[in-house]
Amino acid sequence: GRSKIVSAKNSYHGSTHGSLSVSGYESRKRAYRPLLPNIEYLEFNCDDLSVIDGNTACVILETIQGGAGFITPENNFLIKVKKRCEKVGALMILDELQTGLGRTGKLFAFEHYEISPDILLLGKALGGGFPIGAMITKKSNMDLLQKNPILGHITTFGGHPVIAAAGFETLSIIIKNKLSKKTIEKENLFKELLVHPLITEVRSKGLMIALIMKNDETANQLVIKSLNKGLILFWLLYEKRAVRITPPLTISNSEIKKGCKIILSVLNSI
């Protein structure tokens, strides 16, 4: 069988052995080697997909790169990857732990880009505050996990009834209350308010927002000083000029205005 996995440079998929192996950030991986072998990388949004070849078992990508700076796919990049995977017989995996469950304005971010992955990974918001992870794929793929060996033997807490109930109810509320659609209106409000000379760019897809500052130090001061004023922001892993804004989908317009007021007051003090 095939063992080669293709991931993207500056990707982040987690901190456990397998997910760290496919993350594209060497300085965070160095202390934990040896990791999984036969991992190769492509540039996100690059047209050269030759690394995906007949030895490739799967390609794993974030639909929107998070730690790299909230980088959205351009020029039909995901469609090209999907077609390349189909050509060589590899599976396309999309990691939507950050982008899924309504955050980008659709239930799943891949819906913006006219493709469907072979395997979809979910977590974080799916549990509504409870720890949960999910792998979603078609039945024929799941059937492959029924033998040699059966997948079920490797999980201690898999399918926990309380967490499964929390996940079901969270998904139901997101769909019933149309929270995905409402994120676009809230995104527009953020972008309308967050105008300042120290902000060079606002990257956003729904309520997945990154403020790109003039330099690392400005970003660092904004996060720390905002926390002192009661507002939680955060950094991104690789893009040090960026400040993350990823509030709950239920955030109100008045809360958005209050938060933006704090951000602008901090920037005025820098």
Model regions: which residues?
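Conserved N-terminal phosphate-binding loop of PLP-dependent enzymes in the Aspartate aminotransferase
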Residues: G1-I270
